[in-house]
């Protein structure tokens, strides 16, 4: 895994790389978690923190309605919107698919961790309590405010996986 995870994570963190390559790297990391989650454990905390950072920095809140005006604060001009189809080499990290990929990775990592704990693995969780609190806050914010509906739903699912992992770690798996 030393040959795979660090270079892929370096691509994800590099803002000079096109968003499509960053998403592909996240997808490959998710496949690593899905294929053999024990192998990714040495990197789990760094990856989780990195993806929470990415989600926090690259979140794109929906336009709000100005008080008393009844219309959005956006002027309705969508010329600045860039899609991956029209510009596949875009480095715009605010695109929803990048957030979706990060949320998918986090969900898989949390689900795999929950399964390992339920199997009675001697695995010690690399996730400190502060990371759970931060992840919960970021996922709640994204699920409530993101401009993209799919991202909001995926954030809710990731938050549910986080809740299940916390419950399992506390021995409440039968209640979750």
Predicted features along the sequence, with ranges:
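Amphipathic alpha-helical segments within extended alpha-helical solenoids and repeat-rich scaffolds
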Residues: 1-16, 42-84, 124-147, 176
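Extended alpha-helical scaffold domains
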Residues: 28, 32, 36-39, 43-47, ...
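Eukaryotic acidic, Ser/Thr-rich intrinsically disordered low-complexity regions
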Residues: 135-176
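Extended parallel coiled-coil rod domains
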Residues: 85-93
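Positions within the helices of HEAT/ARM-like alpha-solenoid repeats
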Residues: 17-22, 62-63, 94, 98, ...
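Alpha-solenoid repeat scaffolds
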Residues: 15-19, 39-40, 58-61, 116, ...
């Amino acid at each position: 895994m030393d040959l795979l995870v660090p270079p892929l994570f370096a691509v994800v963190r590099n803002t000079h790389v096109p968003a499509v390559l960053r998403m592909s790297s996240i997808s490959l990391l998710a496949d690593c978690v899905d294929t053999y989650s024990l192998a990714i454990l040495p990197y789990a905390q760094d990856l989780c923190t990195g993806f929470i950072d990415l989600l926090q920095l690259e979140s794109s809140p929906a336009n709000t309605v100005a008080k008393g005006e009844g219309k959005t604060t956006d002027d309705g001009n969508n010329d600045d919107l860039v899609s991956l189809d029209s510009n596949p080499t875009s480095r715009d990290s605010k695109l929803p698919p990048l957030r979706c990929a990060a949320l998918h990775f986090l969900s898989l990592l949390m689900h795999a961790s929950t399964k390992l704990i339920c199997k009675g693995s001697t695995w010690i969780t690399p996730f400190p309590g502060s990371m759970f609190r931060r992840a919960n806050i970021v996922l709640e914010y994204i699920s409530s405010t993101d401009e993209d509906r799919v991202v909001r739903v995926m954030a809710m699912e990731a938050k549910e996986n986080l809740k299940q992992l916390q419950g399992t770690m506390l021995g409440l798996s039968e209640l979750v």
